[in-house]
């Protein structure tokens, strides 16, 4: 049974409903999933079939080959995970914009109850808002996102310090909110839905079913995937990243490799651009292919941690209170404090992508310096093509284009320079969001938007006043290059580097990972 703070129920049960449906929009996994666990419980309670529907929609601004490939690779894993479990899993790919505009409504008309993910931003939020309008069955909105339930804390946190103090004080109650590792174990005795009913519902909404063969072709990558994607009305100029395969299988492989080999050096190596010091799992977290509770549980198990090891005082410090080695505490601060502050903020502040969501002091100081002469001023196109005077910034932008991520520390520098080299701070914020949403595998995410907000003063304090930045914290490429070894990083992501592993030409690179 999930914690009450993770569940909001709307509407009434449909007395004529034939099944329970879980509309999977963000927690795209079969394990460690509060929403799936709750859906199984509901289906058992009503003694009805459970149908899980996972969609790839095209009707959003940044639909492209990169995002689509990653999601469809996750569908392949989910199809295998749901096989022979007592739950019917239906992956659906929209082949034309608004093709499936009536699909959700028709399913809800025939459902006793619907479970849907609670994700506070971008397209999953739009789907949730749409579902709330229908009012044809009981709608269960479930938060499977962070260590802390994002709406249950009752407040927005303006600093990491304030969230750490809250977490330190309430840690015990959060330890009771872990979902089941394998919620499908409780679905074995559920009745199955008739195939003809599924076909009838799709037909009624004028929506074609997606053949498995199509999922497989996209997931293969290379020329096979490229040809399959060409039929979709999406942006084909943002290619898949063939070195990053979507799905729960790859997510768990990468996480376990980090846990066993690199976590112990995390605090020393994570900010080194030339090292693989960070976990690198943010794309899989964003798409819900792995859950934060699995990660935290496996850390606690590996280090034999329990809540009795928490030490006073409750003073908001970054480390030293978990009772764990320093690198482990540093990682927990990222995966809990900084990740949860983003989800809580976006849940509490609906207009979190707007300039007006910045702290008042930040808006004021940026306004006071908005007419300062910039050392350089670039267009959005110049930023996107990595055509600035700064080799380190260009390398970070090339990494974003080629790999769908930017190294943790350099992502902060990337944003600070866009602020400095844009015509004004409002434009800088819009451009950061556009570049990151379009190219980043972990874009369109609460942590993306709060990270960009941090560049502009969110979750921070005022610093020494200077030109352009005002009292916003400043970062420079020169100081970064003095702190860290960046030569190899710049060379790796230089403009002339071959793009074969990005553009999808040639044979699939995924076969070796399967």
Regions found by a protein language model. Give the residues of each.
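Trp/Phe/Arg-rich N-terminal binding region typifying the photolyase-homology
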Residues: 1-190, 398, 417-427, 431-451, ...
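Short low-complexity stretches enriched in small and charged residues
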Residues: 4-13, 46, 67-74, 237-239, ...
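Glycine/tryptophan-enriched, flexible segments
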Residues: 16, 149, 156-357, 488-514
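Short charge-dense sequence patches
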Residues: 19-34, 51-59, 203, 242-251, ...
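Short coil/turn linker and secondary-structure boundary residues
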Residues: 73, 137, 193, 246, ...
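A broadly conserved detector of short glycine/acidic/proline-rich loop/turn motifs that flank catalytic sites
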Residues: 120, 145, 167, 259, ...
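Active-site-proximal binding-pocket segments
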Residues: 272-490, 494-496
């Amino acid at each position: 049974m999930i914690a009450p703070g993770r569940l909001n129920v709307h509407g009434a049960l449909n007395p004529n409903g034939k099944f329970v449906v879980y509309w999977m929009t963000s927690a795209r996994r079969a394990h460690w999933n509060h929403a799936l666990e709750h859906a199984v419980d509901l289906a058992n309670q009503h003694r009805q079939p459970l149908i899980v529907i996972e969609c790839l929609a095209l009707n959003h601004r940044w639909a492209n080959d990169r995002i689509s490939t990653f999601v469809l690779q996750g569908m392949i894993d989910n199809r295998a995970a749901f096989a022979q479990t007592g739950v019917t899993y239906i992956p659906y790919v929209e082949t034309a914009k608004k093709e499936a505009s009536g699909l959700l409504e028709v399913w809800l008309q025939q459902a006793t109850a619907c479970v849907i993910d609670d994700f506070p931003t971008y397209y999953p939020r739009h789907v949730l808002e749409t579902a709330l309008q229908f009012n044809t069955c009981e709608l269960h909105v479930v938060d499977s996102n962070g260590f802390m339930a994002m709406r249950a804390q009752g407040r927005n946190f303006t600093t990491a310090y304030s969230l750490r103090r809250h977490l330190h004080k309430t840690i015990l109650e959060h330890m009771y909110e872990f979902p089941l590792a394998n919620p499908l174990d409780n679905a074995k005795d559920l009745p199955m839905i008739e195939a003809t009913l599924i076909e009838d519902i799709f037909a009624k909404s004028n929506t074609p079913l997606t053949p498995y063969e199509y999922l497989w072709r996209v997931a293969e990558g290379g020329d096979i995937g490229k040809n399959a994607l060409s039929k979709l009305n999406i942006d084909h100029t943002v290619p898949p990243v063939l070195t990053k395969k979507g799905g729960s299988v790859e997510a768990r492989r990468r996480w376990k490799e980090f846990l066993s080999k690199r976590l112990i050096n995390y605090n020393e190596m994570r900010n080194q651009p030339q090292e693989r010091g960070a976990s690198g799992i943010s794309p899989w977290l964003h798409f819900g292919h792995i859950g934060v509770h699995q990660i935290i549980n496996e850390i606690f198990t590996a280090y034999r941690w329990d809540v009795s090891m928490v030490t006073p005082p409750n003073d908001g410090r970054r480390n030293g209170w978990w009772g764990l080695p320093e690198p482990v505490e540093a990682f927990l601060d990222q995966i809990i404090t900084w990740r949860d502050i983003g989800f809580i903020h976006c849940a509490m502040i609906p207009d979190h992508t707007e300039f007006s969501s910045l702290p008042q002091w930040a808006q004021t100081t940026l306004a006071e310096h908005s007419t300062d002469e910039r050392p350089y001023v670039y267009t959005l196109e110049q930023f996107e093509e990595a055509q600035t005077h700064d080799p380190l910034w260009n390398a970070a932008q090339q990494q974003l284009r080629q790999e769908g991520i930017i190294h943790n520390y350099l992502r902060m520098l990337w944003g600070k320079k866009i602020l400095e080299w844009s015509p004004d701070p409002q434009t800088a914020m819009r451009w950061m969001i556009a570049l990151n949403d379009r190219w980043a595998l972990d874009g369109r995410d609460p942590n993306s938007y709060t990270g960009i907000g941090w560049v502009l003063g969110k979750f921070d304090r005022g610093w020494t006043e200077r030109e352009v930045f005002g009292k916003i914290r400043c970062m420079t490429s020169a100081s970064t290059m003095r702190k860290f070894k960046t030569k190899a990083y710049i060379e790796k992501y230089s403009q002339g580097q071959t793009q074969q592993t990005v553009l999808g030409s040639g044979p699939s690179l995924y076969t070796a990972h399967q």
